Swiss-Prot record:
Name of the protein described by the UniProt record: Uncharacterized protein YqcD
Domain of life according to the entry: Bacteria
SUPFAM superfamilies named in the record: XkdW-like (SSF159865)
Pfam families for the chain: XkdW
Species the sequence originates in: Bacillus subtilis (strain 168)
Family in the record: To B.subtilis XkdW.
Database matches in InterPro entries: Phage_SP-beta_YorD, XkdW-like_sf
Length: 111
């Protein structure tokens, strides 16, 4: 069983260099999860085996390519930027209205 591929099958957007690290000490002991930074409980051996078996039965599965992950991240950032620009425009418009109201009030008091 390949632990890293089993985890990527269950969590396809996980980054195996940041979200989890599988380690093998090279001394004949099995590989193990050395670090786990995914917001979910560390999987049990049984869960890993189940995911591995599901992966084996899914012939079309391929781990996500780094370019695909970056493209997804970029599109999320573009969406966030657009939302911030819209919010900034709304705030600017509201501030202009408030400034105009203040100037109108100040003009009325000065008469």
């Amino acid at each position: 069983m390949n632990i890293g591929e089993a985890i990527l099958f269950k969590y396809p957007t996980a980054d195996p260099t940041k979200d989890f690290i599988v380690q093998n000490n090279g001394d004949g002991t099995p590989s193990y999860i050395a670090e786990w930074n995914i917001r979910a409980p560390i999987p049990t051996e049984a869960e890993l085996k189940t995911w591995w078996e599901e992966l084996q039965s899914t012939s079309a599965y391929e781990p996500p390519v780094q370019v695909d992950l970056l493209a997804r991240e970029l599109s999320q950032e573009k969406l966030a930027r657009k939302q911030l620009e819209e919010l900034n425009q709304t705030l600017g418009s509201e501030l202009s209205k408030i400034k105009l109201q203040l100037l109108t009030l100040q003009g009325g008091q000065g008469s």
